[in-house]
């Protein structure tokens, strides 16, 4: 491994030898504060006496989340009233709890998911013209996974700005995520400085730290990027971001999955862990056997806790937002598969050897100090672990983070599920994420205290054969025990959005088209006049306690059109190859679409996708740079 590292390091330094980057300014540390207050490293604090270190999941919502949702409801209610009135619909008798869930898939998922969010923002002219803009103001929860967690972190930390504004003024995603166009030496020097400071304190440092810092330096606010002070913690967001401090945005949840000792392939029933600005934990522990989970204050994550009490030394700063985003997106197990298509044999051999060593050393996961050590040892399967080992939750095939929004305690009424998964040969979704969550829900239902409320959905073949993976579909329409899931799959309304998960850079015009196409997957490109009304009906249906017997005529007509009817054609479908700049055939067959010509915005076709040999070579170069930097640090 040292030979590989040396070769990578020399090649990296050779590319920067003729350009001496300017010194990166570092903020002077205040004398009374530890290093971690100003940098990526955690810092030591006095242990507080008024903290509940472990909260059993069966006790309901934590106090921080409960207070946030109560404050959020006061803003959500008038927003929903306004949106319903605009459609000529009745105001719900109670405020519905609405969630959005953004799938994983690297930058593709980040851009497509944020495009979908943009379709719900009244700040977007096109979304407002499409009459879906404004609904984000009625959303209470937002969950993100992998690339969807990048979308979550960037959107929340930047105060809910329009994604196209972030692209224009902040993001530097035209520079390779881990192999920047310039300043490579300063980039890796800063990585070394920040991660070494964390390591010196005795905390584990792995590839996730580097990956997360790289992500943060492309999408987080500039003051918290690697070249400045990368010290934005998840727990500090409500105090740092005014729009979160006053509950003007949905409460963010970022999701990861546990990889148990000895596992190479993550079980679909693996423990799902969630990070919020208030807590870290899981609603259900274990994979083979499920038991009620628990939560700990995320502000003190990294503190050694034994049976609910700290061991004398407490820490803050472990919950760096970049680290949480990196934890949710540990894509490197999948790098083995992607390398099979890399053009350079030498490159493939070098990176494969390095990644193999990482896998053996458990450096390809994220290690979280176990706050639940010796807690509830009779039922807690992680009571004897020093670290909780987390990976990208998409590795469980639950690539849409629905589970946190299906927990009965949160009382979610409707979920808008944005799916940009790489399920098919041509990198389009086929419903795998929803079906996997449905199958997992059956396992969780075996224990009353771990169940989630997931409606039935068709098989993957049924999704494709029914066309459900090409247009919005409502699931759980007449099952009043579950939320209504409004499934929004990515579709090439105006752009070839089926780019590779491992495409590590996007030109700004390409990223802009990705955002617009994601928005049009939700708005249907303003081509279906009844869609805004039907979208409103689905979002609020549960708060009326409607069924097919008492729904309004307007909303029942919508549900007759958009609800899954229970069919499941399990025969092997033909390859799914949607046409760019087209209307989904189902919309045409059902006489719902007025055609693309009447839709606002540019619908110019873009040829090709980013899964070409050149893109794969870019993947390889990014991995070279990343592994080179890691080798210098570990």
Curated annotation (Swiss-Prot):
InterPro entries: Acyl_Trfase/lysoPLipase, LysoPLipase_cat_dom
Glycan-linked positions: 50, 56, 122, 231, 246, 269, 311, 340, 384, 430, 478, 498, 525, 550, 569, 591, 603
GO molecular function, one term: phospholipase A2 activity
Coiled coil regions, renumbered to chain: none
Leading EC class: hydrolase
Any Pfam family matching the protein: PLA2_B
Keyword Kinase: no
Enzyme Commission no: 3.1.1.5
Keywords, alphabetical: Glycoprotein, Hydrolase, Lipid degradation, Lipid metabolism, Secreted, Signal
Extent of the signal sequence: 1-19
GO BP: any one term: glycerophospholipid catabolic process
Catalytic activity: a 1-acyl-sn-glycero-3-phosphocholine + H2O = sn-glycerol 3-phosphocholine + a fatty acid + H(+)
Cell compartment(s), UniProt: Secreted
Domain PLA2c: 46-569
Post-translational modification: N-glycosylated.
CDD domains assigned to the protein according to its UniProt record, in alphabetical order: cPLA2_Fungal_PLB
Any one annotated GO CC term: cytosol
Family: Belongs to the lysophospholipase family.
Record's function text: Exhibits phospholipase B (PLB), lysophospholipase (LPL) and lysophospholipase/transacylase (LPTA) activities.
Protein name: Phospholipase B
Annotated source species: Cryptococcus neoformans var. neoformans serotype D (strain JEC21 / ATCC MYA-565) (Filobasidiella neoformans)
């Amino acid at each position: 491994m040292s030979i590989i590292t040396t070769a990578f390091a020399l090649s990296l330094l050779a590319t920067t030898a003729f350009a001496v980057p300017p010194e990166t300014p570092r903020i002077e540390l205040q004398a009374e504060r530890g290093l971690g207050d100003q940098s990526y490293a955690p810092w030591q604090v006095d242990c507080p006496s008024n903290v509940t270190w472990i909260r059993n999941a069966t006790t309901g919502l934590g106090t921080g989340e409960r207070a946030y949702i109560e404050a959020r409801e006061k803003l959500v209610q008038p927003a929903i009233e306004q949106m319903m009135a605009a459609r000529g619909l009745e105001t719900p008798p109670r405020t519905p709890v609405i969630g959005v869930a953004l799938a994983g898939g690297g930058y593709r998922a980040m851009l497509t998911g944020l495009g979908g969010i943009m379709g719900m923002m009244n700040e977007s002219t096109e979304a407002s013209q499409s009459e879906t803009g404004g609904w984000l103001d009625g959303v209470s929860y937002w969950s993100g996974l992998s690339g969807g967690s990048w979308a979550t972190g960037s959107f929340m930390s930047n105060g809910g700005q329009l994604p196209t504004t972030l692209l224009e003024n902040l993001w530097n995603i035209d520079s390779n995520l881990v192999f920047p166009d310039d300043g490579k030496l300063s980039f890796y020097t800063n990585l070394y400085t920040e991660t070494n400071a964390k390591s010196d304190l005795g905390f584990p440092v792995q590839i996730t730290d580097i990956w997360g810092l790289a992500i943060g330096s492309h999408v987080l606010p500039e003051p918290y990027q690697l070249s400045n002070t990368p010290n934005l913690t998840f727990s500090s967001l409500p105090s740092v971001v005014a729009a979160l401090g006053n509950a003007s945005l949905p409460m963010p949840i970022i999701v990861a999955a546990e990889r148990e000792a000895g596992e190479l392939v993550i079980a679909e029933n693996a423990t799902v862990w969630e990070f919020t600005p208030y807590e870290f934990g899981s609603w259900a522990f274990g994979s083979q056997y499920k038991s009620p989970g628990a939560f700990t204050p995320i502000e003190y994550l990294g503190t050694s806790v034994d049976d609910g009490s700290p061991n004398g030394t407490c820490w803050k700063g472990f919950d760096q937002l970049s680290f949480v985003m990196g934890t949710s997106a540990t894509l490197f197990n999948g790098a083995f598969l992607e390398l099979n298509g890399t053009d350079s044999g030498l490159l493939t051999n070098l990176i494969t050897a390095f990644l193999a060593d990482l896998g053996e050393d458990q450096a390809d996961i994220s290690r979280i100090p176990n706050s639940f050590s010796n807690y509830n040892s009779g039922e807690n399967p992680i009571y004897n672990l020093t670290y909780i080992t987390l990976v990208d939750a998409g590795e469980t095939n639950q690539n849409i983070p629905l589970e946190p929004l299906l927990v009965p305690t949160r009382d979610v009424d409707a979920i808008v599920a944005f799916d940009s998964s790489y399920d098919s040969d041509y990198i389009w979704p086929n419903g795998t994420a929803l079906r996997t969550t449905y199958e997992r829900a059956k396992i969780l239902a075996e224990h009353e205290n771990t169940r989630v409320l997931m409606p039935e959905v068709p098989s993957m073949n049924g999704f494709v054969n029914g066309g459900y993976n090409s247009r919005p579909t409502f699931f759980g329409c007449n099952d009043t025990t579950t939320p209504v899931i409004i499934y929004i799959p990515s579709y090439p309304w105006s752009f070839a959005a089926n780019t590779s998960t491992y495409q590590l850079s996007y030109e700004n015009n390409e990223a802009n088209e990705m955002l617009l196409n994601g928005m049009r997957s939700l708005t249907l490109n303003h081509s279906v006049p009844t869609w805004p009304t039907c979208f409103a009906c689905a979002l609020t249906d549960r708060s009326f306690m409607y069924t097919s017997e008492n729904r309004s005529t307007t909303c029942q007509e919508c549900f007759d059109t958009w609800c899954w009817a229970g069919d499941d054609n399990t025969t092997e479908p033909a390859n799914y190859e949607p046409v760019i700049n087209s209307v989904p055939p189902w919309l045409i067959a059902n006489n719902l679409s007025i055609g693309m010509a009447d839709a606002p915005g540019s619908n110019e076709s873009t040829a090709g996708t980013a899964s070409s040999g050149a893109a794969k070579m870019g993947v390889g170069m990014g991995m070279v740079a990343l592994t080179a930097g890691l080798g210098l640090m570990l």
